[in-house]
Amino acid sequence: MHHMELTHPHSGLRSIEPHRIDTTPVRRHEHRVQSVSSDYQRLRRLDHLVVGEDDASTIVTFVCRWTGVPVPRLKFHARRSPFTAATERPRDRVVAESLALGLAISSEVSVLAPEGAIRLGRSVTLMTLSHELGHHLVHHVDPFDTPAHGNVWVGRFDQAAAVVAGLLSA
């Protein structure tokens, strides 16, 4: 896994103010994350902290600029839970993967954001946000055949979570 430098000043960043929730669902990939994560307890702490659209946008922009990847298009949906989200691959990534696999390129590729996208609820837990940022980092840094919820992704999830947690203490 390619390691990214994670040291950056917080100067000029406005304060992130999450609110706390007490209960969270069991996650689908919980066992893998728990067994591979370098700081599973940090992830669990982030799962109890919720932010709205403005803070989520600020966090995503900061993490992406810090790690040197493009900022994804953010799509907020009122009906999406704070615990669920989805990441769309960048358009060029889909085209490159299709070409490498000898597949026809779908006409639907043209609607994909060039930088990728993340779909979130109007409020989102910081663990969910870190989870999706982990996918976004994989899409921009790692080979296209990197498993969606494999060990490399858990490492990117941890990297994003470390930056997010650092913002809270800034």
Label for each model-derived stretch:
Residues 1-127, 136-170:
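Active-site-proximal or metal-binding-adjacent scaffold patches in catalytic folds
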Residues 132:
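Walker B catalytic acidic pair
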